[in-house]
Amino acid sequence: MKTKVAAIYGKRDVRIREFELPDITENELLVSVISDSVCLSTWKAALLGSEHKRVPDDLENHPVITGHECAGIIVEVGKNLTDKYKKGQRFVLQPAMGLPSGYSAGYSYEYFGGNATYMIIPEVAINLGCVLPYHGSYFAAASLAEPMCCIIGAYNANYHTTPYVYEHRMGVKPGGNIALLACAGPMGIGAIDYAINGGIQPSRVVVVDIDEARLTQAKKLLPVKQAAEKGIELIYVNTAGMADPAAQLRALTDGAGFDDVFVYAAVPSVVEMADDLLAEDGCLNFFAGPTDSQFKVPFNFYNVHYNSTHVVGTSGGSTGDMKEAIALSATGQLQPSFMVTHIGGLDAVPDTVLNLPDIAGGKKLIYNGVTMPLTAITDFAEKGKTDPLFRELARLVEETHGIWNEKAERYLLAQFGVDIGEAA
């Protein structure tokens, strides 16, 4: 099977590659990858090349496919797997394999990654339960289940304690105060959505950022009124220009501090502020992954000793987290499409990945069978003045107030002849 992929060849070197995949073994799957959402972790891998802990050596001869937030259709089933998988079955990938090597789809494999028209899912991933059935018809929601899974995993990884009881109570504190720092970006939107609509029921959620445009968009998508209807006080705060942001944020809790603080940017000042915001028994979740292996920030160990403050760090999520993300998206309880601001084809991946931190907006969604520059949804109408493709896409997203949706996805895929039925 001939495939077209975006692959890492070295530091800051991502290219489109076309080649013949080998035949699958009796314990492998050949799949068509319909969609993949671009993760900042992919930029980190492309930035570092083989110096990244998950990226192997010899990229020049064995480049690795980028992308891991993907969904698609099974095309061919190895003969030992026919009792479990069927041709034409839709799937979503759980990329958190948990291997001692750290190897994972989108970082480590020449034939296994989300930015590909076709890929081979290896036996190790299948045995680890990484291929999850997807019964929906909206591929974007399936791709976005992976970032939502990471968000859910972070909420589940937080913990709290009782003095002299040597068992952790997992999860955020029920009825507690949550602070979401640097959290009005694409992943932040998902974190706010889950805090309000995921059933965890905090009493107060404070969303902090220094980008007013992002905060305005977050307020529009997840309004204060919606949270209030669920008994949750939602507060958006721009700390830019504040002389003492930690003090002003603590004042929102009458000085008590926050039970759970999530850090969504690997910025020393943000991490230091997170430490300052912790209540007694407060849990700081360092969600953002730094590129610097020597990233160090001062921490108040007086509070660790006397106030039982503590830190966790999370990367990825469990299969259970992924299943929860899929289920909550399917019922409409969560809206992962809120995170999407740009759409593009496979040809757009190299530039998108290499410049990701500099591209404004939220998640960038790639359709591998499509040829299309990365385009902001807000630009569809303007481009539609001269291009009928964008004219119709603009009309379709207008139905959902500028949010990417299944109708728009189906139209786009149809224009490029992408098979979303039983792939052949």
What do the predicted segments below correspond to?
Residues P22-S37, E51-P100, G113, A125, ...:
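Glycine-rich beta-strand-centered segment in the early N-terminal region that forms part
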Residues P95-N177:
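NAD(P)H dinucleotide-binding glycine-rich loop of Rossmann-like/cofactor-binding domains
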